[in-house]
């Protein structure tokens, strides 16, 4: 029974693992106070480059994945330099333009990417266990990052840049690091997806992908590392759960996001953490009041 259940929902579980990596990449850059949505473009770079190196040049899959990840890191660091001069909505517009440039290159660079027809004939060298191990390691590394001096610097920059500067935090340096880490996650998991799905299409990393990666973090929460994981689980499972609604599934998707943003603006996980802290605080104060003098 359990085996049949796992076989039936294995593609959904694989999708969850891949998108957990994408959500973590988006989470890292947002936590540093940078409103970047460039991860869709960085993911496309990692996926297409890794697949092309193996399909066109015959490189081994691990080497292609490594090179796809490294190039995504390099591009993300080059992108961070001009973005350091921008803030807020201007960062979002600039990174959206970057994504559009990458998607256009995917269509017009036919020799490398296969053009509008996409890239096919990719060997399926990445299975569920590889995705699971990669996702678990990524969660662990991001959790360690949050507890480190780098994570505290990210928090300071996000909350108030002026205060962060007064504390000696080099904003440009830490935002560059955030872009590099985000690019590493995007490029690595993009490369894994390339060797998991047999083929790539230009629209695979387009606007819906961009919105999904951002929604995972907004829905789950932007403070705890479990925020993007929970957000990914909810939104990946939602189409399957709401399948009986047929054409109304996207309506349910949108309404859920609206409700969470209105009533849980900090996200599901962060709201739950705040609730638990408040409960403990109230319980502690009640015990102190009942304690004999």
Where are these regions (language model features)?
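Transmembrane alpha-helices and adjacent helix-loop boundaries
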Residues: 1-293
């Amino acid at each position: 029974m359990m085996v049949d259940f796992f076989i039936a929902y294995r593609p959904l579980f694989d999708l969850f693992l891949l998108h957990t990596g994408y959500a973590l990449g988006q989470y890292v850059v947002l936590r540093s106070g940078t409103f970047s949505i460039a991860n869709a473009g960085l993911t496309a770079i990692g996926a297409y480059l890794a697949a092309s190196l193996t399909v066109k040049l015959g490189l081994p899959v691990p080497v292609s994945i490594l090179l796809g990840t490294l190039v995504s890191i390099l591009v993300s660091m080059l992108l961070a330099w001009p973005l350091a001069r921008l803030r807020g909505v201007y960062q979002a517009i600039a990174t959206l333009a970057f994504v559009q440039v990458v998607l256009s290159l995917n269509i017009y660079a036919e020799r490398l990417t296969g053009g509008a027809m996409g890239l096919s004939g990719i060997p399926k060298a990445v299975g569920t266990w590889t995705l699971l191990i990669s996702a678990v390691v990524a969660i662990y590394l991001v959790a360690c990052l949050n507890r480190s001096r780098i994570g505290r610097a990210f928090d300071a920059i996000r909350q108030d840049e002026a205060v962060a500067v007064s504390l000696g935090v080099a904003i440009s340096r830490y935002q560059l690091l955030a872009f590099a880490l985000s690019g590493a996650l995007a490029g690595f998991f993009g490369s894994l997806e390339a060797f998991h799905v047999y083929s790539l299409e230009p629209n695979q990393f387009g606007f819906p992908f961009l919105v999904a990666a951002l929604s995972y973090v907004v829905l789950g929460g932007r403070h705890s590392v479990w925020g993007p994981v929970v957000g990914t689980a909810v939104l990946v499972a939602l189409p399957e759960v709401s399948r009986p609604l047929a054409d109304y599934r996207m309506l349910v998707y949108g309404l859920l996001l609206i409700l969470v943003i209105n009533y849980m603006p900090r996200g599901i996980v962060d709201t739950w953490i705040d609730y638990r802290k408040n409960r403990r605080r109230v319980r502690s104060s009640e015990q102190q009041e009942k304690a004999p003098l």
